[in-house]
């Protein structure tokens, strides 16, 4: 039987290669690329933010009107990222701004209206630009959560969308897109202040809830995160909504872009290395020495711990700080790179000054340095409060750096704990959100390093052999798409 080629429209608020603020952008670039490589037709739709509209290669291909909207005119610019066609929706009223979502840590007051417009315009433009009706419209997070709702309500009898199914990916359920009804009353469906699919009170709606209630299929970005979304803690208050859709909820672990994170080809790191023991040992030794020199740490062959993250409680800094000075009493070195909460940054700076022979803190996001940390460290610390998928643990394994993680979200799915399965181990993990539990697992890793370095090297090489390529994840998405189409 010939398997049908799917027509997929991937809708996201950001796409790496064009504009990025977080992991959503990575997925929005990598997944469509893999879907295309597997033979499917893929288009991306996103907003034409100021930096995108100003690009020389962003050609205007459509100027049109959005019916029943106060600011009716919009344009569509055509670009491509990694060979995938991109339709970027341009509206001076909504997207001609310095940033995507906020300025000076203050969300734009009209974000509800902006992304309601984006959702409505997406469904308006597709019949005007596509020759082939889409089989799947794949939307992401709250910014696009109204698209499944509008498909079910506004377009339920529209011939172009008659066979189209929607999929919603949840990258982080903390952000729900909560707005007053009046803020999105430009959509006629919301003028009545009664939309049960989206309502969270008599005055407010959640765009994410609308997507969860109306999408044909929902996926979380790891299997364990899908389970966590069924709980009040894991869903941040939306458990009943996810429980209503449990039969349509699936977890698919994000892939890794090995074109960027590959020690054999990495142009950032001081010495490239291959997936064999001799090359790995030599390469990591050279990268560690270069990292030490770069950060003015003593040139010593001691256990090197790395951490690259936003300085927020989500990333588990609150578990590390209480035990950090106790941990630094041991013969080791630690590098932390990141920006975020100034209070956390100040405390890390103080500790780094007190322990300058062991601990370097760099308050910045430096992509080159991030690669150096991944390559030069022996262990990588990720004690997250929650982590829907996580990527640094996957990058770490690719570089033979053993992740030390809390067993949440995708961290639990991707890291095999040494103390649970020595033979197949790829790192270390702990369960409870307690500083002392983190200290115990850190000391466990340090003990192994000091007593059995050969065993550490064996586990590091095994970690390097793990395969989290995007094509494997894309096959699972295709299976989900076909289930949605056939349901």
From Swiss-Prot:
ADP-alpha-D-glucose binds at residue 20. GO terms for cellular component: cytosol. Pathway: Glycan biosynthesis; glycogen biosynthesis. Keywords: Glycogen biosynthesis, Glycosyltransferase, Transferase. It catalyses: [(1->4)-alpha-D-glucosyl](n) + ADP-alpha-D-glucose = [(1->4)-alpha-D-glucosyl](n+1) + ADP + H(+). It is an enzyme of class 2 (transferase). CDD domains: GT5_Glycogen_synthase_DULL1-like (cd03791). It comes from the Bacteria. Its EC number is 2.4.1.21. GO terms for molecular function: alpha-1,4-glucan glucosyltransferase (ADP-glucose donor) activity; alpha-1,4-glucan glucosyltransferase (UDP-glucose donor) activity. InterPro entries: Glyco_trans_1, GS/SS, Starch_synth_cat_dom. Belongs to the glycosyltransferase 1 family. Bacterial/plant glycogen synthase subfamily. Synthesizes alpha-1,4-glucan chains using ADP-glucose. This is Glycogen synthase.
């Amino acid at each position: 039987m010939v398997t049908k080629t799917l027509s997929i429209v991937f809708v996201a608020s950001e796409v790496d290669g064009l504009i990025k603020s977080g992991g959503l952008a990575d997925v929005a670039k990598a997944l469509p690329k893999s879907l295309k490589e597997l033979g499917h037709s893929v288009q991306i739709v996103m907003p034409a933010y100021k930096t995108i509209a100003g690009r020389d290669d962003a050609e205007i291909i459509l100027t049109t009107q959005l019916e029943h909207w106060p600011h009716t005119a919009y344009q569509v610019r055509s670009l491509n990222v990694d060979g995938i066609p991109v339709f970027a929706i341009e509206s001076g009223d909504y997207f001609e701004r310095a940033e995507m979502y906020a300025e000076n840590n203050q969300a734009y007051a009209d974000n509800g209206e902006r992304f309601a417009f984006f959702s409505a315009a997406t469904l308006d433009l597709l019949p005007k630009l596509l020759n082939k009706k889409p089989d799947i419209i794949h939307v992401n997070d709250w910014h696009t959560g109204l698209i499944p709702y509008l498909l079910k309500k506004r377009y339920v009898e529209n011939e172009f969308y008659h066979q189209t199914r929607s999929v919603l990916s949840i990258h982080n359920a903390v952000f729900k897109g909560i707005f007053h009804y009046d803020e999105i009353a430009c959509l006629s469906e919301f003028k009545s202040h009664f939309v049960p699919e989206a309502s969270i009170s008599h005055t407010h709606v959640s765009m994410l809830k609308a997507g969860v209630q109306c999408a044909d299929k929902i996926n979380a970005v790891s299997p364990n995160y899908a389970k966590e979304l069924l709980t009040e803690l894991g869903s941040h208050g939306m458990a009943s909504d996810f429980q209503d859709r449990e039969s349509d909820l699936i977890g698919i672990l994000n892939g890794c872009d090995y074109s960027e994170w590959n020690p054999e080809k990495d142009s950032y790191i001081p010495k490239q290395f291959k997936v064999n023991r001799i090359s790995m040992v030599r390469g990591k030794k050279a990268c560690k020495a270069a990292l030490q020199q770069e950060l003015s740490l003593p040139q010593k062959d001691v256990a090197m711990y790395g951490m690259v993250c936003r300085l927020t409680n989500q990333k588990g800094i609150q578990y590390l700080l209480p035990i950090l000075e106790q941990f630094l009493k041991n013969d080791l070195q630690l590098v932390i790179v990141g920006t975020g909460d100034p209070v956390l940054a100040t405390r890390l700076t103080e500790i780094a000054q007190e322990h300058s022979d062991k601990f370097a803190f760099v308050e910045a996001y430096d992509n080159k340095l991030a690669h150096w940390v991944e390559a030069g460290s022996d262990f990588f610390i990720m004690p997250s409060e929650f982590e829907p998928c996580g990527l640094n643990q996957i990058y770490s394994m690719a570089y033979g750096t053993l992740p030390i993680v809390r067993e949440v979200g995708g961290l639990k799915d991707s890291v095999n704990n040494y103390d649970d399965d020595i033979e197949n181990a790829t790192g270390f993990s702990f369960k409870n959100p307690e500083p002392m539990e983190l200290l115990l697992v850190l000391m466990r890793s340090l003990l192994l390093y000091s007593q059995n370095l050969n065993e550490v090297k064996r586990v590091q090489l095994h970690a390097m052999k793990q395969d989290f390529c995007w094509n494997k994840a894309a096959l699972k998405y295709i299976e989900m798409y076909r289930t949605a189409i056939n349901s």
